[in-house]
Amino acid sequence: MTKKPGGPGKNRAINMLKRGLPRVFPLVGVKRVVMSLLDGRGPVRFVLALITFFKFTALAPTKALLGRWKAVEKSVAMKHLTSFKRELGTLIDAVNKRGRKQNKRGGNEGSIMWLASLAVVIAYAGAMKLSNFQGKLLMTINNTDIADVIVIPTSKGENRCWVRAIDVGYMCEDTITYECPKLTMGNDPEDVDCWCDNQEVYVQYGRCTRTRHSKRSRRSVSVQTHGESSLVNKKEAWLDSTKATRYLMKTENWIIRNPGYAFLAATLGWMLGSNNGQRVVFTILLLLVAPAYSFNCLGMGNRDFIEGASGATWVDLVLEGDSCLTIMANDKPTLDVRMINIEASQLAEVRSYCYHASVTDISTVARCPTTGEAHNEKRADSSYVCKQGFTDRGWGNGCGLFGKGSIDTCAKFSCTSKAIGRTIQPENIKYEVGIFVHGTTTSENHGNYSAQVGASQAAKFTITPNAPSITLKLGDYGEVTLDCEPRSGLNTEAFYVMTVGSKSFLVHREWFHDLALPWTSPSSTAWRNRELLMEFEEAHATKQSVVALGSQEGGLHQALAGAIVVEYSSSVKLTSGHLKCRLKMDKLALKGTTYGMCTEKFSFAKNPADTGHGTVVIELSYSGSDGPCKIPIVSVASLNDMTPVGRLVTVNPFVATSSANSKVLVEMEPPFGDSYIVVGRGDKQINHHWHKAGSTLGKAFSTTLKGAQRLAALGDTAWDFGSIGGVFNSIGKAVHQVFGGAFRTLFGGMSWITQGLMGALLLWMGVNARDRSIALAFLATGGVLVFLATNVHADTGCAIDITRKEMRCGSGIFVHNDVEAWVDRYKYLPETPRSLAKIVHKAHKEGVCGVRSVTRLEHQMWEAVRDELNVLLKENAVDLSVVVNKPVGRYRSAPKRLSMTQEKFEMGWKAWGKSILFAPELANSTFVVDGPETKECPDEHRAWNSMQIEDFGFGITSTRVWLKIREESTDECDGAIIGTAVKGHVAVHSDLSYWIESRYNDTWKLERAVFGEVKSCTWPETHTLWGDGVEESELIIPHTIAGPKSKHNRREGYKTQNQGPWDENGIVLDFDYCPGTKVTITEDCGKRGPSVRTTTDSGKLITDWCCRSCSLPPLRFRTENGCWYGMEIRPVRHDETTLVRSQVDAFNGEMVDPFSAGPSGDVSGHPGGPSQEVDGQIDHSCGFGGPTCADAWGHHLH
């Protein structure tokens, strides 16, 4: 039985049975009802009524309301909407009846109505302004005018207009103007938000609001990523964290491509740790360190020590930004040379980009179908951007016919924020350098530049291209002279200084010019490509809105990741670039060598401090007053044995004054391990114990430990089972990694022959040792020594040793030996044969019939992988075979390129094993590599220069070089194997094919060149010495066959050897007489022509030769088939039918050599007709560099 709560409820403080209604404010209740309806909750009739209200007012209903509308059943909706229709009909009838009654009223009421209408017009006129636009009435309104009907009195009566635009704000620069069409009675408005009932008018209003900014486009401009700068830089690049992401991607790629090495690194990391946490950390660190060895060269100390030989009079320095060099030489004071600042002034503005724009004064002119094309008068103003189009017109928007009407919209473009690019002129760069002497520097004067200058111990000076040399007086220390080459610093032609907001960056020139943003030049005020920061929205019948994109500053900053940040105001401080100087020390002298030794007691004013560069600074206080006197200071290994160890950086330190308690700073370099710094003599001697971490052997073993941690990751090389040597290479790679560092530290100064002999000696001692442990130690050490002495291990980059005529790429050696022979230890390999086979298949389907190799190493690569490619093609049912023919003459170019693909062919173990023993059968279709040009595969259908070096790998007998497909099409040679150097009076341009040597003797001139083969790519400007202002007609080795565009590639009396014997093998170009011949200079000699061999077809020697204005000794080419002279040197009176001439022509087939306009068949020593002479030998009608000859330079050899 349920108990009712009636009784007990009476005695409660609050009677639950007699509670009143909740006290809610009426407006709050109305708000709750409306909000619930907007959310789609409530009676169906109310929901439909609210949707009808939104429909009549041209407002957008909420998503929840639309969802409820779609959920209503059809019968229920039709029932309510029919009742709405009946109610609307009743209202229409009532209005019609009211209109008839008003017409029957008298004149007094009519006058009252007229006065009321006039008052309304006057009230509206207070807010609305009327003017003219395009010959029609223009009304300017604000957001208060759109609530009711706008009545405009005209000569034809009242013109009532309705404006239902939702973007009306207050008047500002952001205005929009468009037409309100006339709608006849009974036509509903369609695709218009403004209309009138009597005549068309234009409406204008501002779009600004006081609560938010103007409407802007959601679209953004795509800005290409700048990428990492190629400059060596002392400061961090902008947004350098992007490198971390790329490095993680590289690590992942390395693990996928090197599963065996990754497993080995993980095993080593697991063995190193004593618990699971340490094991995980060590494993992650090893995997992260592994690919770093081939990432790039990182870490560079900002202080280097240079030791001059005894009696040296000069030393070459290379100063970089924020670097310091300490120069020590026997019998000379120690100098510190510091690059203080690199500054460029008077930057020239190149181009400005707009990254934030505003759009104002929008106007639209529309026409009905068949009434002509719309034309906006503002199109004539260059500050406006216009766009024409078509819209749907008809009765609902003021046109009598249905169809497409013309529309023309214009908007004014103005730039709010811009990024400015400026170029640096080489002549405006100045280098501020300071020189400091390690003399009697007191602690008060240390770092005090003005005090050191007063003591003639320091000097600052500025080096500019106009003043590259300076002599400094250093008081009693003598004087020092610096001859510098400012042009060897930053390549100003490749970079711009770009200022975005308050930040400035050093950006690549090509990236800057390719930015997809509006731009203008300094001499113009008009912006180009303005539409990139504007968006014309979808056009309506008579209206089209235009909005500007938001600020692109954030996108620019993100794209600039990797660029170098610089400081710019009126000048820019550079942190990149270098300055090469020759420091002449012949007039430097030590000060105080005749002083006596100090006899009183010294004390350490402060404890000796480590400088971080392996040296220690000691501040001494001298109690005596017998100065100036020399300081007896030495570093010893033991106090019982006073034999000096280490060395003094401050040469001949002395106390300069006679005042007591004077303080002096001395810098010295103690040995590794424990030592004592001893100051003074006899019983007044003091000492300080010093420990320098590490040792010579310890440093070697620490390097070995790092090598073990990097563990066989010299390049991004795959775990390669493609050849039988792959497994052995990986073992050798591990040996190199673990012991390579110690090997270079301990034996790096010896020749490889000495290293090999030491290894053989240790092996012999191991074989003959009786004790097993000693025997194993000798055998292991000797084996590692022999292996590391004979193998070629890899690094990245190329270096040149001019004196030994040696070029190293990685640690592989490319030697030009004394007998003029090339010995190369390089082996080119594709990234993977599977992907290369797919690339070949794809290229063949696209109409590429073959390839031309760029170099002999690429040709050898095709030969090496031919069979494996053919097996892959056969296994994947592709009727195609790769055929490699012997190259003929020089390596020619071709117009097409191979394109990259992510797809790969697959091959099983059985097919791979079979490919080692048997070559596959030839298919019906062929892909031809090199060989002579044939009708089946002409050069115009071949690909060339499609590969570039990705990384240097490892090999026991050769350095592996991994190739990948180029992403861009270029004619330049691969810069990864190019090295350039200048040392003393010798300059060299070199790669794996060329050794081009120039010497300085009054002027720079080409001395000799040795060619492993002749190729048809162009030498990149980034690896060219002294390349500014060079005319290609003066280049002896033509630019079209990889001749450097350098002033080192010139020689007085000779022009470009475009018709030299470049199709011969084993070419050596030098300046000497061919055996058994003589050359005379005479004006009666013939003009330039193709190079001629000094022996005829039958082997007869031609002894007499001449030239018009060449320099002697003459230019000659030594080849496997004989000796040839240059184009300026002609045979004297010889039967031309027996001459052997060069068939090479570096120009287009329709052109002639611009330096020899005589008869083409006349190559002998008589003049050959009237001609105009220039420099005694040049003869051409077009004039040097004239319009008809301008294109002669730059055609590739085909």
UniProtKB/Swiss-Prot annotation:
PTM statement from Swiss-Prot or TrEMBL = Genome polyprotein: Specific enzymatic cleavages in vivo yield mature proteins. Cleavages in the lumen of endoplasmic reticulum are performed by host signal peptidase, whereas cleavages in the cytoplasmic side are performed by serine protease NS3. Signal cleavage at the 2K-4B site requires a prior NS3 protease-mediated cleavage at the 4A-2K site.
Q: Where is this region: Disordered?
A: 1152-1177
Q: Transmembrane segments in this chain: where? A: 110-130, 254-274, 280-294, 747-767, 774-794
> From what superkingdom does this record's organism come?
Viruses
Query: Is this entry keyworded Membrane?
Result: yes
The residues on the Extracellular side of the membrane are: 131-253, 295-746, 795-1198
What are the disulphide bonds in this sequence?
Answer: C297-C324, C354-C410, C354-C415, C368-C399, C386-C410, C386-C415, C484-C581, C598-C629, C798-C809, C849-C937, C973-C1017, C1074-C1123, C1085-C1106, C1107-C1110
GO terms for cellular component: extracellular region; host cell endoplasmic reticulum membrane; membrane; viral capsid; viral envelope; virion membrane
Q: Where is this region: Interaction with host EXOC1?
A: 2-15
* Residues making up the propeptide: 106-127
Those parts of the protein on the Cytoplasmic side are: 2-109, 275-279, 768-773
Q: Using the UniProt annotation, give all residue ranges assigned to the region (Hydrophobic).
A: 37-72
Is Endoplasmic reticulum a UniProt keyword of this protein?
no
The alphabetical list of record keywords is: Capsid protein, Clathrin-mediated endocytosis of virus by host, Cleavage on pair of basic residues, Disulfide bond, Fusion of virus membrane with host endosomal membrane, Fusion of virus membrane with host membrane, Glycoprotein, Host endoplasmic reticulum, Host membrane, Host-virus interaction, Membrane, Secreted, Transmembrane, Transmembrane helix, Viral attachment to host cell, Viral envelope protein, Viral penetration into host cytoplasm, Virion, Virus endocytosis by host, Virus entry into host cell
For the region Fusion peptide, give the residue spans.
392-405
Output the InterPro entries linked to this UniProt entry: Env_glycoprot_M_flavivir, Env_glycoprot_M_sf_flavivir, Flav_gly_cen_dom_subdom1, Flavi_capsidC, Flavi_capsidC_sf, Flavi_E_Ig-like, Flavi_E_Stem/Anchor_dom, Flavi_E_Stem/Anchor_dom_sf
Swiss-Prot/TrEMBL site (Cleavage) positions: R105, G106, A127, M128, R219, S220, S294, F295, A794, D795
Q: Name the Gene Ontology molecular function terms of this record.
A: protein dimerization activity; structural molecule activity
Name of this protein:
Structural polyprotein
